[in-house]
Amino acid sequence: MKSKLIVVSFIWLVILFVFAAAWKLWWVPSQEEAVEQAAQEAHEEAIRQTGSASKYRTQINFAYDSFSGYSIFRSENFKNNLSQKSLKVNLVDDGANYIERLKGLQSGKYQMAAFTIDALIKASDEIGDLPATIVEIIDESRGCDAMTGYKLAIPDLDALNDPEVKFILIENSPAETLSRVVMSHFGLNNVSEKSFIPVANAEEVYRRYRESKPSDKFVFVLWEPYVTKMLENPNVHDLVNSSRFRGYIVDVIVASRDFLVKDEQAVRDFIEAYLSSVYHYRNTMESLVASDAKEAGTPLNDEQIKRLVKGIWWKNTVENYAHMGVESHSLQHIEDMIANITKVLISTGSISSDPANGQPNILYYNKILSDIKNNNFFPGKENLRTESDVLPSLNDEEWSKLTPVGTLKVPKIVFARGTSKVTSQSEITLNELVEKLKTWPQYYLVIKGDASLRGDIEANKALALERAKSVERYLLNHGISSTRVKAVAVEPTGSTDVMFQLGYLPY
């Protein structure tokens, strides 16, 4: 009996101990936590009751970087325009980390951002999602980016077709885009990913140039003001720069699709504020870029500023209407830009597949620009600046003095046996060539017909010339200006190919 009493007493002691422990370890802290939470809520309510309503209707976190083309985002006029629309924009410089930038749009960390079109495509492929859409075009590179090299080692783009040639550049930058455009469009079968030597920043590319020799087979792919510095060396030349082609190095404003659905008005207000600032600075971009560079701690001299501003085409309101298809004009449509850039990225191995699955239209949203145009939004009188595809005509002597740029990569043109008639399959190839030539409007084209060494050489040369002229006629009939094309027969090498060499008239 006594032992049972001891057991029962022990059990009750355990139960009391458990209750005491629970009271001390759970109930008391929970009560204290509840009291603290109530006090915190009361404090927060007091803050709300003793504050004022914000002047801003919406806040937008906008991811971008220090590129001079983005100087308008950092301007006082843009801030004032946003304030008038009750928008607060927090600019976040992520050091051009495009993957994290797109992930930020995906997660809601950012609502809007600046991208180059190629970076948007590559980042979308990398994360396997399309969380952002293009709503406006910021600018297009027009000479700001260039590929330079020593004249002795690399006289033209054809000389790049050498496994010993190395490209010194920054990955995921306009410099890489420029290099991939050249890889895709010219006959550079010996150039591969191994040809690229990525470095951390522009200063490192320039340092590599300073340490190189004229015999080094290096290509330095950079932007202003470094290009100007390198070209001060008479032994260095500009192999190609972004003023020679169109629609590949293009900066755009993108919006998170979720945010766009949630608050399209805020995106519209942002775009109107930005385009108004583009108009405001239309005649003073040099001053803005100079002050922006000085503020960033990287002051530029007058010549560097002039070349930098000349190399960037900031798109105004009417040009955005044209690019986005809101108005019908001769400017390249953004859908074609996206398709062309995607093709370059796939053909050069930068991405394995098209993240838009052959539907470039899902990467842009033109409704906002359409709406503001229909509401007669024009910040001022602006001109739609166009580029003529018609080059000055040349005489025979001038044609003979063209400086070669490089030979375009074109699949073999096939003719009906013994004739100059282009086959239907090769007509498809020539149609693609027409589109390619439209993106290189600043160069003349020499169509070179080669001939077999068998049989009657003179007859073979005559056929080679007729085949070159047949191709020339096809291009002219499909919109290529007659002033920029010349068909010739070259001294026979045994091949029966037709080659396409771009060139320019030296000044």
Q: What is the predicted role of each segment?
A:
Residues S75-F78, Q106-S107, D125, L152, ...:
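Sec-exported extracytoplasmic/periplasmic mature domains
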Residues D263-S353:
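Secondary-structure end/capping motifs
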